[in-house]
């Protein structure tokens, strides 16, 4: 089957679309990446997403309209990746769309129950591409008592399991998340959870202080020094003290967190602030390994993915934090994969599993009461 996986993450870099060919289903599936592209958001759409993400600027009319606008954007992105791969839409069998997360509340707070909302209307995607769309992957896991995240562990088992090596798969997107993929698999041996901010805080600080979308290759962070006072403040965040399974997002590490950070510590200088929040991402990752993984698993390899794996300063900080551990550290490209395409590929794989009615959440990672089939299916019109 030819499947397009669509991912629009918390970092708002754009729309990632992976066109893959999948043979079979289940953990023995064979997955081949045919083509990958990122379609940047136009300025107006990105601004509307940012407005929708903020409780202060969001409203129901905005979210309602944006839901359909993003559906059209996602459909156009699918058409673009197929065109670049010289594949007609008629040859495309399935689309897996994660959608754009507007709000994610993994646990009950007061009168608000655990819930999540991703937008990007699947009916629009299905109509425009004339292809079946599977979307809303997180909701069934949450209905089953899970946190709806992380969902990539199932795909990581398919793509990265090794006969003799225990591996850690660390994604560094807007949020960081880790998956333990042991050489001998069982339902309870695969664990996964969010490790805290990935690029989210780094990018926000970079945009506010340097008017740049991100710190390319970690060049600016390399120029500063880590301020212990700031790092201690960040590492005392309550999320880092929670036991897995757990998930997080902009609700905890978004605009409000960064605004408070800059208000408290702006006197320390721009470069030092960026260096320190880069170290915060690295330290939060290392902290979670040493606290929740390394005491229980003998890890052979750590494989870094996501946009953060291109930040050389961040990667070096992670290496230094793990230098006493007996594990090799790679990025996706070192082993023949793509850091950028990883999550889009994951949702193509999850779509394939849903198409075959296979459960694809990992309860030991999300906290769900049971394994469930993920997603809603939207069929195109008969033409």
Swiss-Prot record:
- Please list the residues that bind ATP: 9-16
- Could you tell me what reaction this enzyme catalyses? 1,6-anhydro-N-acetyl-beta-muramate + ATP + H2O = N-acetyl-D-muramate 6-phosphate + ADP + H(+)
Q: Which GO terms describe its molecular function?
A: ATP binding; kinase activity; phosphotransferase activity, alcohol group as acceptor
Q: Which Gene3D superfamilies match?
A: 3.30.420.40
- Name the pathway: Amino-sugar metabolism; 1,6-anhydro-N-acetylmuramate degradation; Cell wall biogenesis; peptidoglycan recycling
Q: Which CDD domains is this protein grouped with? A: ASKHA_NBD_ANMK
Alphabetized, the UniProt keywords read: ATP-binding, Carbohydrate metabolism, Kinase, Nucleotide-binding, Transferase
What Enzyme Commission number(s) apply to this enzyme?
2.7.1.170
Give the InterPro entries listed for this entry.
Anhydro_N_Ac-Mur_kinase (IPR005338), ATPase_NBD (IPR043129)
Provide the GO biological process annotations. Answer: 1,6-anhydro-N-acetyl-beta-muramic acid catabolic process; amino sugar metabolic process; peptidoglycan turnover
What family is it from? Belongs to the anhydro-N-acetylmuramic acid kinase family.
Q: What does this protein do?
A: Catalyzes the specific phosphorylation of 1,6-anhydro-N-acetylmuramic acid (anhMurNAc) with the simultaneous cleavage of the 1,6-anhydro ring, generating MurNAc-6-P. Is required for the utilization of anhMurNAc either imported from the medium or derived from its own cell wall murein, and thus plays a role in cell wall recycling.
Query: What NCBIfam families does this protein map onto?
Result: PRK09585.2-1, PRK09585.3-2
Descriptive protein name: Anhydro-N-acetylmuramic acid kinase
Organism, as annotated: Bacillus mycoides (strain KBAB4) (Bacillus weihenstephanensis)
